Amino acid sequence: MSRSRINGNFIDKTFSIVANILLRIIPTTSGEKEAFAYYRDGMSAQSEGNYAEALQNYYEAMRLEIDPYDRSYILYNIGLIHTRNGEHTKALEYYFRALERNPFLPQAFNNMAVICHYRGEQAIRQGDSEIAEAWFDQAAEYWKQALALTPGNYIEAQNWLKITGRFE
């Protein structure tokens, strides 16, 4: 039984129902349908905190999915899991890969900025202000890209950019 069928979460059930209806009415190949089923099950596992299972489903979806746009969201979600697990280098890699396929993912730019900002704060705690500034500058660049895509979002980031003199 697929995860989406055993998940008790209302939103996940609603998503699964709508997704199943769309899969029936939109002309897609069996491979695309199978890829989406793995993606859907990965999202379900991820929402329950079952990250290892989510990753298995996402990797299988990546194996089957051919559309670059759809692949970008799979890669983005893999990045989210690595971020959650504190594997920031891996997370950045997956966000980059997602953006290569879909440069209009402001949430990926935002998450990359958050990681860079965090690393900047770590460098400050370690007494390395030069490295910290480099990380903060990189965070600023990513936040600017996120804001360029969605000007009304990421207010805290926008304020940080203004306060630190990095807003242009």
Swiss-Prot record:
TPR repeats lie at residues 35-68, 72-105, 120-153. Belongs to the Ycf3 family. Keywords: Chloroplast, Membrane, Photosynthesis, Plastid, Repeat, Thylakoid, TPR repeat. NCBIfam families: PRK02603.1. SMART domains: TPR. HAMAP family: Ycf3. It is found in: Plastid, Chloroplast thylakoid membrane. InterPro entries: PSI_Ycf3_assembly (IPR022818), TPR-like_helical_dom_sf (IPR011990), TPR_rpt (IPR019734), Ycf3/AcsC/BcsC/TPR_MFPF (IPR051685). SUPFAM superfamilies: TPR-like. It comes from the Eukaryota. Essential for the assembly of the photosystem I (PSI) complex. May act as a chaperone-like factor to guide the assembly of the PSI subunits. Coiled coil: none annotated. The keyword Metal-binding does not apply. The keyword Membrane applies. PANTHER family: CELLULOSE SYNTHASE OPERON PROTEIN C, TPR REPEAT-CONTAINING PROTEIN MJ0263. It is a peripheral membrane protein. GO terms for cellular component: chloroplast thylakoid membrane. This is Photosystem I assembly protein Ycf3. Gene3D superfamilies: Tetratricopeptide repeat domain (1.25.40.10). One of its GO terms (biological process) is photosynthesis.
